[in-house]
Every structure is written in structure tokens, then in C-alpha cells.
Swiss-Prot record:
[4Fe-4S] cluster 2 binds at residues 153, 157, 160. It comes from Tropheryma whipplei (strain TW08/27) (Whipple's bacillus). Belongs to the methylthiotransferase family. MiaB subfamily. It is an enzyme of class 2 (transferase). This is tRNA-2-methylthio-N(6)-dimethylallyladenosine synthase. PROSITE patterns: MTTASE_N, MTTASE_RADICAL, RADICAL_SAM, TRAM. The lineage of its organism: Bacteria, Bacillati, Actinomycetota, Actinomycetes, Micrococcales. Residues 372-439 form the TRAM domain. It is found in: Cytoplasm. Its EC number is 2.8.4.3. Monomer. It catalyses: N(6)-dimethylallyladenosine(37) in tRNA + (sulfur carrier)-SH + AH2 + 2 S-adenosyl-L-methionine = 2-methylsulfanyl-N(6)-dimethylallyladenosine(37) in tRNA + (sulfur carrier)-H + 5'-deoxyadenosine + L-methionine + A + S-adenosyl-L-homocysteine + 2 H(+).
Amino acid sequence: MTYTVRTYGCQMNVHDSERIAGVLEDEGYVKSGSDDADVVVLNTCAVRENADNRFYGNLGQLLQKKNNGRIRQIAVGGCLAQKDRHKIFEKAPWVDVVFGTHNLGSLPALLRRSRHNKTAEIEIKDFLETFPSSLPVRRESNYSAWVSISVGCNNTCTFCIVPSLRGKERDRRPGDILAEISALVSEGVLEVTLLGQNVNTYGVEFGDRSAFASLLRKAGAIEGLERLKFTSPHPAAFTSDVIDAMHDTQAVLPQLHMPLQSGSDRILRAMRRSYRAGKFLKIISEARNKIPNIAITTDIIVGFPGETEEDFQDTLNLVAEVRFASAFTFQYSPRPGTPAASMPNQIPGDIVQERYDRLLDLQNRIALEENRKLIGKEVELLVTVGGRKDSMLDNRYTGRTPCGRLVHFSCLHQLRPGDFATVKIIYAAPYHLIGDNALTVRRTPAGDVWIQKNDTRSAQLVSLGMPRIR
């Protein structure tokens, strides 16, 4: 039988989808080459309302395909499944299986049971059954991998539904994490992202407050690992020893995603974020003093209940001061069951939209100005997989700088995902850069692995097509 997994939401879900694919293939399922398959798995997100709406809209489209015989079974997992449970069957009785965030490994058995009994099956666990990293995995990338160091979250942010769906923080032992990274590197992986809901509280379960900084140093020392990243930290628990470890460990990339959410102390207090703007700015200042070329990115929520124009101006002022390389900006979305959803002074949508547009305009200007500083500089890129299959043979590629910036460039030599290329930047836009023809190329074992997994006709691969310079 064939399968496909559609993923909504955050990096946690992307990594969970790799595990879902792994347990299915371990049972003999084969990945479909299209969006249609015998089994369609939807790995859902519950963080914002628009994710809910998109999911239920897609379920309606799948009904027609199921009636036409193009799909045999539909399974729904992830945070929305954990939250809505029986509601999914009420809204979409054609769904066959609903499973939660804590029991990914149960999916094959639930699918078998549903086929045998010709009934819908639901299994939601309220506690972690098996740590996801102990399950089989099917990774899409030959050069980059997620490695989970913890699951769950002990914070109580008033806008966030994740702790109630993912549970309290559970930490993996350092030895297990390092062993997984070593195994990945032996398979050709060059880049690892350490993944957790709040990575810098890693170690809380075994009482070691310096555990995350120590983990960075030990992981970065693994021979063959060229790039090491992590996401996401929390400003309240972020400490100097992590910045020191980033500075001292060559493999750790000069990039830091530090969620702000708001620049207003009053709103941060209402969000129950446990830090204030001054603490945030102190972290940024220390990071830049110790790692001058570091790129800082962030998350910002616009329109939190009770946000005044003065509060919003505090956010704009902080954004202008910090000058983020990029920012994930969101309009506040009330989630049922969270304290913020029942707070007074919910902000009208037109005001939220107007503020959101102003923030986006400011951040885009800053991102463009920061990117323009790179024009004329030479940067080393990790070649990544592009999205335009019709331009895979025209010697145009895409890659990421150590700071995480996206660069489109040309190369007269054949490149594979996982190879490295050095280019000179000739053009900048807010969200990407353009490089001249590659100056040097470094082929890697990761590129060799890509060749082994792909036929030679597509081996010239990775171009997106060069954006026009306007």
C-alpha cells in the first residue's frame, strides 16, 4: 500500500512526520509519488485558527477523492487531533483514524484495525508513550536532519495551547542524542538542528542547568558535523553559557532565533512570558558582542488582547533597535481553552491588520538594509534542494549562508544538495540574496548520498530559477 503525509505547522510537526513515515515504511508501506495514496495522513497544527480552517477545508477535498477510490484511508494526527479528538469525526465522518501527539507509533495498528473492522478508530494518549526519537524515521534530506532533545513545555504562556497538547517537558539523555547525531553524520548528514519546545531548559528532568550548553559543545565536537543549529530557546531561561558555547564551538552557526512576541512589558506580563524587554535586549547585546556576525531572528504577535497603540509602538521601537534579520509575524488568534481567549479588550480585526502591515513594512525595510550589507562579500553556501523541477538542468542553484540567509546563484559545475559553494553576493532583496557564479566548490559525502538516492537524469538538481533583478 502507498502512503503520503501532509504536514501543517512547526518544526516539531515536520520531525514528527518523518517519524510517521518511518513507522509506516517499517510496516511495508511505500511512499507515494503524488498527493494521492492508499493512505493519506494529515499531521495537524492547532496554534492558530487559520490552520484549523485550512485543515478542515482539505478534509472536504479528500472526501471526493475517497469516494472516487483514489484514497482508501484518511488518518489525522498532530496537535489538532489531540485537541479536537471526537470533533473531527463529527465534522468529517469519512476520516478513518485519529491519533495524538503522544502515540505516533500506534498508527499502523490503528489503520489495520480500521480496515479489518470497517470502523473509525481513535486513540489519544494524554502522556508520552514512546519518545519519538526511538521510532523508525524516513528523512527527506540527505544533508540536514532534525534531532529532538526534548518534547513538551513547562511554560504557561496565556496565548499558547501547545503545553496542553504536547504535555510537560521530557528530556532525552545526552548520550542518546549524541549517539543519534554520530549515526547521522556517518550516513552523510552535515547539518543538524537540535529541536525542542524550549531548548535552553534542557536538563530540567535530570537537574543539570548547564546541560544545553554542554550538549552544544559535545555535539559540535563530533567529527564530520559541519553545521549545528537549535530551535527554539526562550528568553526567560537563556543564559550566558549558551552564548559562550556558540562562540567557542566552530560547528555552531552564527544564528539565533529568539522569540520576542511583544516589545511591551505590559503585554509580556499579560502573556505570562516571564521576561521583559530589557532582559531581551541584554541577551541580544551579549550575543552580538561575543558573536559579531550573528543573525538574530524572532517571533512577534500583533493584536494581543488589550494591546494599545502605545504597546504596539514599543514593539516597533524594539524591532527598529534590534534590527532582526527576519521575523515570523503573526496576528493574534484566540485559541479556545487558553487564558488569553477569554481576556477582555480583544482587538478588532481591522486594527490588528493595520498594525500587522506596519510591522511588516518596518521589518522588510530592515531585512533589505541588512541584506544589502552583504553585497560584494564572499559567503560559503550549503547547497539545498530547490523547488522548480523545470529548471533543474540550467546550472542555477540555491543555498544557505552560515547565518541562514537564502542565496540563489549559478555554477558551471554540477552540484548536489549537501555540497558547498563559495559565491560573491551581487544583489539583495528582503528575503533572499543573489550570488554570482560560484568561485569555489567543495563536494561532500552528503552529495554522494544524494546521487545514490536519485537517478542520474535528475542529478543536476537543485535550482529554483534565478529571480529577476528589478
